[in-house]
C-alpha cells in the first residue's frame, strides 16, 4: 500500500498569467517595477511539489515578546526588514504544460496588510492556547494568490511554565493591560521560498540589533580546501565524492525500512504543536564536558531518550530499538542570503530510542555522528532533492515514499544568538521553530538555543501522537537527569 495518498499537490500554485501585474497597493519601500519571471530552482521546486494536504511543507516559527508592540509598528518593521528580499514579494505561477517549471512572479497586489493578521486568543493567552493555535495553523495551506508566507501578531500572550527549573524566567505576574502584557509573532513560510537556516537568519534580522550569526556548514571545509587546491585536484575530489555518494545510495536503497511503531500509521490532517520549558545551555555543556560529547550530541541523545520513553508502552517497543531521524545539514556556507532558496542536504541519523542508559545512548549517538561527518551523505541527498524537483510527478512520489519508509521523524538542532534581542523596543524572550515533515513522516523535533537557553519544539500528527508535549516533557527529564548525574 503506498504511503503517499493521491497525487502531488496542485492547488499550491495556479496559473496567473492573465492577471494584471501593474504595480499597485505596494507596501512602502517595496519596488514598483516588475521583474522578469524567474524559474524555481530544482531544489525549491522539489519542496513545492512534496507539499500535501495532510503534510504541509511550511516552516513555522514563534518569537515571544516581553511587551506588546503597536501593530502599525510591527508592520513597519516587517516592511523595512523583509521586503528588501524580492522573493518575499513574489507568488508562484504554475506551468501551462505538464513538463513545465513553476516560476516566481511579482505579486501585483502585494500589500503588507495581506500578509499579516492580528490574533486575539484568551485574555491573556498562555502557552497552551498558543500551542493550540500554532498546531491549527500547521493544518492549513497558505493563500496561493500571494507570496507563500504569513505572519500573525498574537496579542496579550503570557508564558506560564515551571519557574523552578530556570529561576531567571518570570512565569506570569503580568496584568491584562496591553502595556504590560506580552505578545507573540507566529511566522509561516513555505519551504520552497527558503530553507530553515536562511529563514532563521531573516527572522532574527527583524530585531533592533540584527546579530551576526553563522551556522555550521558541511560545505565549509570542502570550500576552504578547494581554495587551496588545484583545479585538477578539485575535479578529482568531486569525482571521488560522486562515486562515494553513488555507493552510499546503493546501500541506502537496500537497507531496511524503519521498524513499525505508532509513527508508522497513515497521516491525517490534524496536527499538534508543543514546546519544552527552557533548559540552561550551560547545563547541557556540562553534560557534554563530563562525557566528551558536543552540545549537539547531547541534545540528540536526549531527544532519542525522550522518544523512547514515549514509545516504551507500545507493543512494538523493544530494548535496543533504533529509529532513523532525518537531519537537515547546512550547505549554504557564507554566501549572501539575498536570493534565499534551499541549499541543504539530509542525513539519516540512527536514533537509539531503545537504549535507556543515558551514557550508552550518548556514546551511540557520538559514534553515529562520527560516521555521518565522514560520509558524503548530505551532498548526495542535496543532489537527489534537485533531481526530484525536475522528474515527472510519479517518480517524485516514489522518491518521497522511499524517504517515508526509511525514517520515522525529522530532527534538527540550531545554535541561535547568545544574547537577548529586541523587537521594536520589546525584549524577545524566546525563539522557537518547527520543521515540516514530508511523505508519511509525521513527527518533527526542532531544538534551538537562544540567550543561553535551549528549547525543543515538537510537532506531531494527532493520529500518531495526540499530545506532543509528552516528548517535550520527557526531553526535559532526560537532560535534568543527566545534569544531576554529572554533579
Residue ranges of predicted features:
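Soluble acyl-CoA-dependent acyltransferase catalytic core bearing the H(X)4D motif
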Residues: 3, 11-43, 50-52, 56-441, ...
